[in-house]
Amino acid sequence: GLVECPVPLLGDFDPSFLELPREVLLTSMQEHQKSFGVEDASGNLMPHFLTVLNLHPKDLSLVKKGWERVLRARLEDGRFFWKTDLEATFDEWLEALDAVTFLAPLGSMGEKTRRISALCRWLAAKVQQDPEQAARAGRLSKADLVSAMVGEFDTLQGIMGGIYARKKGETEAVAAALAEQYLPSGPDSPVPGTGLGSILSIADKVDTLVGCFGLGMIPTGAADPYALRRCALGITRIMLERGYRFDVKELFEEAQRLYGDRKWKLAPAEAIAKLNDFFIARVKNYFLTQGKETLLVEAVTAVAPDNVWALGRRLGALESMSRQDDFPQAAQTFKRVANIIRKQGHEAG
């Protein structure tokens, strides 16, 4: 691994730092000091940290004091950022977002949060969520990007948004949604656990997809600088795992409408068509990575592919049928019927 002669070292820090959020403490230890937090039997953090040295020092106590001194400085920074952010308001952060660029042709982060807010409201009506709460979560979704804490620890974006939302009097539903908005962060990452978090995650990803496709920023080969494939996979997983049944093409069109009048590289209809093809390709790929048979995946996505949840249901049903002994004979019968209908259609034409 990382060390040839591992020597564990247990250090301490001032218990007063435990007033900081757990996530801040652990990130300070892990990112800056390559150390681990220490928990008690109940899972609460203790004022200690554990690191691993690469040698047996002559004076272990001196080395310990050095590590503690450096970590203390980092935690002091964290406490300063924490107190600074608690004095700020969401309104101040939202105003500051108007000066933060999302993607140059697509405007500011402030504009993005307004679009996300409107799209969350639209989605809420589709999946029986509170539209006002959904819109509020969308509007606050990127506010923590201009906080002092996220400026120092960018891996805490979203997480700090949720923590600050609770501190500043937002509802628990909104706070949880802010913390979950970047889920799933990878193929093995969980999807959001709440309804508001799910639609916020979808709205954010769809806004990025629609904007990038309108500008012609379509992934090719291994090049995917804006992680659009991951966006599509995340939407797919959320829709399947949460049981959302809305039409994705309709969702894309609504997101495009919210961009208003812009100078796009691709015509709006062309961009939506290309995005829809791209998205269905990612859905197919997801099914294949789950071990589904190629022929079955191709069969279910050949008809009405815009409802991802329905695709999953049809694929499951077809899988069950394919395991039955008479499936080959039934498939051949359907094929003959389809050929007859197709032939009659040509003759009638």
Where are these regions (language model features)?
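Amphipathic alpha-helical "coupling" segments that flank catalytic cores
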Residues: G1-G349
